[in-house]
Regions:
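Short glycine-rich, Thr/Ser-proximal phosphate-binding strand/loop in the N-terminal lobe
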Residues: 12-40, 101-105, 277-301
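Asp-based phosphoryl-transfer active-site loop
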Residues: 4-14, 256-262, 379-382
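Nucleotide/phosphate-binding catalytic cleft detector across ATP-hydrolyzing
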Residues: 1-5, 20-22, 30-38, 42-45, ...
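Long, internal scaffold/assembly segments composed of regular secondary structure
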Residues: 228-302, 306-307
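A glycine- and small/hydrophobic-rich beta-loop-beta segment
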Residues: 304-364
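Short acidic (Asp/Glu) and glycine-rich catalytic loops that position anionic groups and cofactors
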Residues: 23-25, 288-290, 327-336, 403-410
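Short beta-strand scaffold segments in enzyme catalytic cores
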Residues: 13-19, 81, 254, 262-267
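Short acidic-glycine loop/turn motifs at beta-strand connectors
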Residues: 19-23, 75, 258-261, 268-271, ...
């Protein structure tokens, strides 16, 4: 018996076929079929055909085989999340970090009491889900209740996940129910000062995404696609990193360099609080994801040069590289053909990965310690530019990250490097909930 794992991305639909022992039987990728008159299920059917002959691949549209088909998606903009919190450096920051760990693209963060202008800004961000947080358990609930009333009266139609002061949740739910708002209550993301509790909110965001969001993006004409999707793609990838860390028995860090963004994931072993940590800041999120929306190989290429200049990296002054960046930004489908163009892409990837790793590892707020990455045992590279790189090229990118000792963070001291060449992290993550044994077998191949 085989399992079909599919990632419907904004550009490509990728799939892996694994057997009942976790062995990789086949993998394939086809362009995602999005746009007017298109249906993403066309791309899913296409990638199934590319995997192998009829009969060898589970049929995603056959209800009898649906348990063997697991899909994640970032098409249609993925999961757009807005965070409404109290203090920017505390509850709102905790909500922001938890939202990223849930695989969301955080499109707006509002702090303090929502005003008329604040509600307008929130609505303009077009969130798919609003994460409403505020206060520690048993603490001040005034701002949380005020914001619940504002949301209830607003024209923001997105469902609300409430993850604030649990002692005020019944009142918050009552306020939202007055105008029939779709609300999901879950545990506080910051139950007490210095403690982040991400798991319940992450699960609630995932459930709301699957129940209310994915079916409303216009990606497919019927309900079948929404019934297949189990997670937003970054959520599945983080779950895969968690499985990989468990299999490896140590801390893992992943740098995923994409066309528009560069994501960094880390799964770390909890440690004692740093002695320099101030009492009011948000504690370390041990399973974390950060997204750098200005760093990418094509749509995000200009941002790489801007970040290089801000970080005082010398590549920002290369006129030939700047010319290449202008070309690929204007034509994202452009691929390098000459040795010089391949070198330009490698420099872009190295710079994006290095800056993204710095931002992931640096303190998130004044008074915090850097993220404790020094004990990471595996740095895994991902993204098309690394998967399809010439021999040794991806090693250069990852080696540069590990050698970055002047970037205001603590790089891993003794980490090995690998590249997810078969693109299996998402597959391990999708299997983690349904078949953890297969998830571990898939992750062991990385």
């Amino acid at each position: 018996m085989s399992y079909l794992l599919v990632d419907v991305g904004s550009t490509f639909t990728k799939a892996a076929l694994v057997d009942d022992r976790g062995g990789l039987l086949a993998r394939a990728a086809v362009p995602t079929t999005v746009g007017p008159g298109r249906d993403v299920l066309e791309g899913v059917a296409g990638v199934c055909r590319a995997l192998g002959p009829g009969g060898s691949v589970p049929d995603p549209l056959d209800p009898a085989e649906r348990d063997r088909v697991l899909v994640c998606s970032s098409a249609g903009g993925g999961l757009r999340l807005a965070v409404v919190g109290y203090e920017r450096a505390v509850t709102a920051e905790a909500g922001h970090r938890v939202g990223l760990s849930a695989g969301a693209k955080v499109v707006h963060v509002a702090t303090g009491r929502l005003t008329t202008a604040g509600v307008a800004d929130l609505r303009a961000a077009r969130p798919d889900v609003v994460l409403l947080v505020g206060g520690t358990d048993g603490g001040n609930a005034e701002v949380l209740l005020h914001n619940a009333r504002r949301l209830a009266r607003s024209r923001v139609g997105a469902p609300v996940v409430v993850a604030g002061n649990v002692e005020a949740q019944e009142e918050v739910a009552a306020e939202l129910a007055r105008t029939l708002r779709r609300a999901t209550l879950t545990d506080n993301v910051l139950p007490r000062i210095g403690v982040v509790h991400p798991g319940p909110a992450r699960r609630a965001i995932r459930e709301v995404f699957l129940e209310h969001v994915i079916g409303g993006k216009g990606l497919s004409r019927g309900p079948r696609f929404a019934q297949l999707v189990r997670a937003a793609t970054p959520d599945a990838v983080l779950a895969g990193v968690e499985v990989l860390a468990d299999v490896r028995g140590g801390d893992v860090m992943v740098v995923d360099v994409g066309g528009a963004t560069t994501d960094v994931y880390s799964v770390l072993t909890p440690q004692g609080e740093d002695a320099s940590l101030r009492k009011h800041v948000v504690a370390t999120l041990w399973h974390a994801r950060t997204v750098e929306g200005d760093l990418g190989m094509r749509w995000g290429a200009p941002g790489v040069l801007e970040a290089a200049a801000a970080e005082a990296l010398p590549v920002a002054d290369d006129p030939q590289l700047r010319s290449w960046v202008e070309r690929v930004h204007a034509r994202p489908e452009l691929l390098p053909t000459t040795a010089q163009e391949h070198e330009h892409d490698l420099v872009l990837a190295t710079t994006a990965a290095t800056v993204a790793a710095r931002r992931h590892g640096r303190p998130g707020a004044p008074g915090e310690a850097p993220r404790p990455l020094k004990d990471v045992r595996l740095l895994l590279g991902s993204g098309g530019v690394l998967r399809h790189a010439a021999p040794g090229a991806a090693d250069r990118v990852l080696a540069a990250v590990l050698a970055d000792h002047g970037g205001g963070w603590r790089p891993p001291a003794d980490a090995g490097t690998r590249v997810d060449t078969a693109y299996l992290l998402f597959a391990a993550g999708l299997l983690a909930g349904e078949r953890p044994d297969l998830a571990r077998a898939v992750a062991a191949q990385l």
